[in-house]
């Protein structure tokens, strides 16, 4: 542990002995770079310094703070879990790993990280970075159940020394030394017993999985304006983008299908529209698919008809009110497209 004591990263959630803050940081760090997380974490802690402050909050407020961090189900599950802890466990985070692991959004990695760092319990926290280190350290090539069990067993042999620090030291090694496509073995405290380093082939391990091409989904969206305000609608709470606001849009086979856009706006929001012109296209990649969005400028023709918002919440907002609501990144690209078209 000499290496960790000397070279560990100075991160705002470390060395504070607060299970809530440790847990929050690990949730935010899933699939997200540390440098991206730091400002989000700091802003969150300023507004919600305790678990109870999260449990008592409005989800829309949490979602606004999370805006841009992506993987929004993390925020939703963290909120649900905090509410459960507040009602069922008197606001105290369970120190039993089985109970903690049963909370929404908590899996083996987060439970191992929180139990080891916050409660000093000897549980490995194995994410992609630590897996990569151990595959190289043990000279394992293929991602099989047998090899994963070997990694877990190996980690349990020395996790007792300083559980949280062991896990965090491996996180730091994976972040700065034993990277996916580049290694700095001369700096690594594990190198002298690392099988792939001793054989001179660390970058060949583990076997790389060929990335699948992201499927492209076509979407058509309507920019609807009235009295210098634009219409935004709220997605229902299901799905990866649940609870976020957006310009009205719908998945289509052909993203120039103007008839389908008209039909969608009529059936869902009781809006009769005519389409004036195409504003442009936006492409945005999420983790599992790409969005190809065609945006059309639309004009309401039944202006006296009340907007039907019984299915989804809807609002007319001015451009300077956009920052009050949480939008997904693809929608922010649409706002940029609108600004360019109006310039």
Language-model region placement:
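Intrinsically disordered, low-complexity, charged terminal extensions of DNA damage-control enzymes
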Residues: 1-10, 15, 175-343
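Catalytic cores of DNA base-excision repair glycosylases
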Residues: 2-184, 190-199, 203, 270-272
């Amino acid at each position: 542990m000499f290496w960790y004591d000397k070279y560990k990263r100075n991160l705002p959630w470390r060395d504070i002995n607060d299970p809530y803050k440790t847990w929050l940081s690990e949730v935010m760090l899933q699939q997200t770079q540390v440098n991206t997380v730091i400002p989000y974490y700091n802003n969150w802690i300023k507004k919600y310094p305790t678990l109870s402050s999260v449990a008592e909050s409005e989800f829309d407020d949490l979602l606004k703070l999370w805006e841009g961090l992506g993987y929004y189900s993390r925020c939703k599950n963290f909120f649900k879990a905090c509410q459960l802890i507040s009602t069922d466990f008197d606001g105290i985070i369970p120190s039993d790993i089985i109970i903690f692991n049963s909370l929404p959004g908590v899996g083996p990695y987060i439970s191992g990280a929180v139990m080891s760092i916050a409660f000093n319990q000897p549980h490995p926290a194995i994410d992609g970075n630590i897996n990569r280190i151990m595959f190289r350290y043990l000279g394992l090539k293929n991602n099989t159940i047998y090899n994963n069990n070997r990694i877990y067993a190996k980690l349990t042999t020395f996790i007792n020394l300083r559980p949280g620090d062991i896990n965090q030291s491996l996180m730091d090694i994976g972040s700065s030394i034993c990277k996916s496509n580049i290694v700095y073995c001369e700096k690594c405290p594990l190198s002298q017993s690392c099988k792939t380093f001793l054989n001179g082939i660390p970058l060949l391990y583990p076997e790389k999985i060929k990335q699948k091409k992201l499927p492209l989904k076509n979407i058509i969206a309507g920019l609807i304006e009235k009295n210098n305000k634009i219409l935004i609608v709220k997605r229902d709470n299901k799905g990866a983008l649940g609870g976020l606001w957006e310009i009205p849009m719908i998945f289509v086979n052909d993203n120039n299908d103007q008839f389908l856009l008209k039909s969608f706006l009529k059936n869902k929001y009781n809006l009769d529209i005519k389409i004036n012109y195409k504003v442009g296209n936006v492409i945005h990649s999420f983790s599992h698919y790409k969005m190809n969005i065609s945006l059309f400028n639309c004009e309401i023709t039944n202006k006296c008809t009340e907007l039907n918002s019984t299915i989804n919440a809807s609002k007319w907002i001015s451009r300077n009110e956009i920052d009050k609501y949480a939008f997904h990144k693809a929608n922010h690209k649409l706002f940029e497209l609108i600004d360019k078209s109006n310039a």
